[in-house]
Design a protein with these regions (language model features):
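Short, Lys/Arg-enriched, Trp-marked, Pro/Gly-tolerant hinge/linker segments that flank
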Residues: 1-36, 40, 49-50, 54-55, ...
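…primarily DNA-binding HTH/wHTH and HhH modules…
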Residues: 114-132
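Terminal helix-turn-helix DNA-binding modules in bacterial transcription factors
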Residues: 35-36, 40, 45-49, 57, ...
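Short hydrophobic/aromatic patch on the recognition helix
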Residues: 61-62, 66, 111-112, 116
Length: 132
């Protein structure tokens, strides 16, 4: 009876929408440095070698540990960041699509548009029109 009462009182807490997710452990120093490097340089060409040299790890080891700690590979992380920045810039009607692409590190507007559509299901122009 006591156990049933305990379970009944605990259920709302367990299924409460305010329950915090289990947090992931903090990133290692090297991966934190890699993330900072990417955030500081997302608007230019970033090579795996550049990041590995910056954090002092081999490229292959960096790739493995980065994925283990962040859950995504480095290229995906870079593209996720670039797409998030692009969305913000597209909401500002003062920039041409080409300028947005260049501002987030893409030299090729067509590739940028294809990747944007892959992420969001619409082209940058369609996205911009939808957020009027």
């Amino acid at each position: 009876e006591e156990l049933a009462g305990f379970v009944a009182s605990a259920l709302p807490l367990i299924f409460s929408p305010n329950t915090k997710e289990i947090s992931k452990p903090p990133l290692s120093i090297e991966i934190s440095q890699a993330v900072s490097f990417i955030e500081d340089h997302y608007d230019s060409k970033i090579s795996l070698t550049d990041i590995a040299d910056y954090v002092g790890l081999s490229s292959s080891y960096l790739c493995r540990v980065f994925k283990e700690e962040t859950g995504v590979n480095i290229n995906t992380y870079i593209n996720n960041l670039r797409m998030a920045k692009a969305v913000r810039l597209l909401e500002d009607k003062n920039y041409y699509i080409k300028e947005v692409a260049i501002s987030v590190g893409f030299d090729d507007q067509l590739y940028f548009s294809r990747l944007f559509k892959k992420y969001y299901g619409v082209t940058p122009s369609q996205y911009r029109a939808a957020v009027k």
